[in-house]
Amino acid sequence: PSSWINREDVEEMEPNKLVSWFLISSYCYYELGRSIMSDLSFDYLVQRLKEHWDEVTHPHKELITQSHLDATTGYDIKFPSIVKMSGNEFLREMIKV
């Protein structure tokens, strides 16, 4: 499949989960060259993240700047190991399906 996280998945995400998937999706796209959600789903994730930003308590919140959200990109983020591991694990699991 070309993408695995859809708009309905994004709709159900809690604010902290939006941060996780922003980072994981950006890592997969920019570092691995793999898209795990459509551009429209990612744009929707960013929209929801902006709307719920003040509710976010995720420890990696500080990695995401307003300019990342405005440009809907995380291309220059230095991804923590846990994001890399999560992205790689997600891709491995989805390939099995």
Regions found by a protein language model. Give the residues of each.
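Phosphate/adenylate-binding "loop-and-lid" substructures adjacent to NTP/NAD/dNTP-binding pockets
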Residues: 1-97
